[in-house]
Amino acid sequence: MTKGIITSESPEIHWKHLNVCGGRVLDLGCAFWTEAERQEANGTTKYFLSQKPEFYMGVDINQGDITTLSQQYPQGKFLCEKADSAFQMDTWITENSITHIKCDIEGDETQLLQIGNVHNLKEIAIELHYSDTWLKEFMAWFDSIGFECYRHDSVSFCSEISVIYGRLKC
């Protein structure tokens, strides 16, 4: 497993190791992080759509950002919902034949641990909050769903956060 350091919230730095080209993407936590990102329309939606996925679905609780993103990126599907239910996440994954997930949902990422069948999923990137507490559980979950953790990045500006990347074992 490769280890690295994330130095920015900018999507092209923060999520650069998740390649979604040709995939079916579920972006959990797709709203803008800063007002500057919002003004520049430079969030994860723009970043992932620039990679030319077959399908893109963004979910976030910020209705204003969901409205803006829906207008800016009509090729995407956007939902204003709180991603805090394993059942709901599993439904989105199944109904949309999701192959790639980016997850940054401020602690609710732990709901993923309850999903046992990831269907068509090939790759996932998860921002862990309180990463020391949850890292071992996510590594075990990866193993249980047939994934390997290929990268673990610490975040230089917040020691309680890290990003793990997993993919289907060959």
Language model features: what each stretch is:
Residues 16-19, 91-95:
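A short acidic-Thr-Gly-centered motif at the start of a beta-strand
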Residues 48, 55-57, 76, 92-170:
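Conserved acidic-Pro-Pro-aromatic motif
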Residues 83-90, 110:
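Short loop/turn elements that flank and shape the SAM/SAH-binding pocket of Class I
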Residues 2-86:
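SAM cofactor-binding core of SAM-dependent methyltransferases
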